[in-house]
């Protein structure tokens, strides 16, 4: 999982990326291709 300050550019890397908020943190999840996972940090 990548840790990035800004997730906007990471969201554009794959069309199936979803931006979700869990426990006050923003995550990028991708069910089809899990290597695009990221967390804002």
UniProtKB/Swiss-Prot annotation:
GO terms for cellular component: ribonucleoprotein complex; ribosome. InterPro entries: Ribosomal_bL36 (IPR000473), Ribosomal_bL36_sp (IPR035977), Ribosomal_L36_bact (IPR047621). Pfam families: Ribosomal_L36. One of its GO terms (biological process) is translation. PROSITE patterns: RIBOSOMAL_L36. Keywords: Ribonucleoprotein, Ribosomal protein. Transmembrane segments: none annotated. GO terms for molecular function: structural constituent of ribosome. Belongs to the bacterial ribosomal protein bL36 family. NCBIfam families: PRK00831.1. This is Large ribosomal subunit protein bL36. It comes from Rhizobium rhizogenes (strain K84 / ATCC BAA-868).
């Amino acid at each position: 999982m990548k840790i990035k300050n800004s997730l906007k550019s990471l969201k554009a890397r794959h069309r199936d990326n979803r931006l979700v908020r869990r426990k006050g943190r923003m995550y990028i999840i991708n069910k089809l291709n899990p290597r695009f996972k990221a967390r804002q940090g």
